[in-house]
Amino acid sequence: MLQLSLFPENTIHSNKFPTTRYQGSKQRFVDWIWKCIKDIPFNSALDAFGGTGSVSFRLKEEGKEVTYNDILIFNHIIGKALIENTNTTLSDSEVKILLSKHRDTSYPDFIERTFKDIYYTDEENRWLDVVSTNIRNMGNPYKQAIAYFALFQSCIIKRPYNLFHRKNLYVRLQDVERSF
């Protein structure tokens, strides 16, 4: 996946890369990596094991042309949304359409059936089925990637400790005193 920079004046810039607790993420080291390579003369870079895209994103912010790669499809989607995409965004009306159930659309219940009582409540699983179907129905691949990325981030935030390594929905649903 190659970052296109045909129209740099339309490039989307952000000051902060979205964080996750993704095992193996280089986000914690990205400033150190940049410090080590910034004086090397180069215009392009290959991020062969792109993962969350934190290194590619930083290089893009520094004006470098980045080729991003990752074997996992959801990471490929993140790369398309944050690295390859230069000027596509979602409007408020598009977000509203994504978050709404539509009478003329048939929604599967795959997430609701498959992941019952594992990561999210039944209502949240139904909502995920609706939103993921609406994303698949979008025509623009960059808008799809942005929407999926936002959905991934919202799913991570909703999880205890931002992790998916075990069935622990009960941790979030317990009625206990919290210090945060």
What are these model-predicted stretches?
Residues 49:
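Conserved S-adenosyl-L-methionine
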Residues 1-46, 54-57, 61, 85:
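S-adenosyl-L-methionine
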Residues 55-59, 67, 76:
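Charged, often flexible domain-edge or linker segments that flank or initiate folded functional domains
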Residues 65, 71-180:
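Class I S-adenosyl-L-methionine-dependent methyltransferase module
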